[in-house]
Amino acid sequence: MKRISLISKALVLLIALSGCSATESKSDVGIELFMFNWNSVATECEESLGPAGVSWALVSPPQEHVNQGQWWVHYQPVSYRIESRLGSREQFKDMVSRCNQVGVDIIADAVINHMSGSSYGTGWAGSEYEKYDYPKIYKAENFHNCGLSENNQIVNYADRAQVQTCELLGLSDLDTGSKVVQERIVAYLKDLISLGVAGFRIDAAKHIAAEDLEQIIAALPEGTRIMHEVIRGAGEDVQPEEYLPTGKLWEFSFSRLMTSFDIESVPNLEESFELGYFIESEKAISFVTNHDTERNGNALTPMSDPVTFQLASIFMLASDYGTPMLYSSYSFTDYDQAPPVGSKGEVLDATCGLRNGWNCQQRDKSIIQMIDWRTKTMNLPTTNFMHTESYSAWSKGELGFFAINAAKKELSMSFQTSLPQGTYCNILLLSGDEATCPGSEIQVGQDGVVQLNLLPQSAVALIGN
């Protein structure tokens, strides 16, 4: 593993010494705070997300879950009570309120495709249940019994009926086409909205018929933000485009493309979009990794290679494609490993500043500055585009310029920008309140040309008046 201190050398972020007078846009940047308890989410909103301009935060499923130790128990509901090892209903409500007060919307991870996979048990908050019997919520007739495979589990992803009516990994599959099930799901989601939630990530949306989700979402208040988890699979019948009418989509193809940085290659987003690998930008949630891809080996991660992961995140924030989602979580050595917990099994506070097993991307200075750069330039046209296998560069109107070097060797060359002539400074060396540049200054000529020495695996972002 590369030393995380290399990030300060690898990511060179620059800004004009003169102030920026451009009209500011509202940030579109979000973050997944995976397994942060409610108190920690509120703290991060107040101390880092709000001040940095992060627009929304995705939090882990808030409902009561199976009472076991692994992280994935949160994705096995046993009731719709807002009570989990991440915190109580009152703590959840307080968290949402505190985040909203500093301009951060809360998106809740909604597990509505299924309930648990356990034969029976008692949930975290004391609710007794059986696999197909959840008192006051669901009975056996509220679940699919597909009869299409052994044990009613999905074995053929090319078969739409199996994907959407059989059991995912043995989890009891709700009959989301029935009126009773839809009403109870809507009641749960409306309960969360009453606590201030702005929208939902629909977990395992691929396993719910698009028409079922249309009916559920239509019953929610207008303006509820929706993002679907639908992984594209070659040769599969169910495809992400079916879900575009009801919300945005997590674009897993973007995450896979970001692994190009691992082989010293800058992803060509324009080419990938033209070849049909991506959904339209306005509907895409772009990300480098999430809680699943972090564990299945299909993405860059903050633990496996922090320098490359951070470089890809900077690239994501600089690009025009999608609505970017950052990622923060905890370190682990085993797939099933839960976050740090207390004596009663409750998830402990995430103390980012102490580096006690938590990866807190939202507190990195380069990420904070890149959010600001994106917010100021996001509505400007992209010009002066250059792309080779190892580097890319582009301008954003007459205000911004970005260049990135994915190679493990230095790149020295001139770039054409649309920036005004001026002196620019390495903002990674700033703590936020310096009046002068503490590092090397960069000159942009009268013709807009800048000579840059891009360090190995580094990025440069310039901002003008």
Map each language-model feature to its residues.
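Bacterial N-terminal signal peptides that target proteins for export
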Residues: 1-10
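Boundary/entry segment of secreted carbohydrate-active catalytic domains
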Residues: 23-40, 168-173, 177-178
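Active-site-proximal helices and loops of the catalytic beta/alpha 8
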Residues: 26-31, 44-50, 54-55, 61-77, ...
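Aromatic- and acidic-residue-enriched carbohydrate-binding clefts of CAZyme catalytic domains
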Residues: 28, 65-97, 133-175
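Active-site cleft segment of glycoside hydrolase catalytic domains centered on the general acid/base Glu
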Residues: 166-179, 209-217, 221
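Alpha-helical scaffold elements lining the catalytic groove of polysaccharide deacetylases
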Residues: 176-188
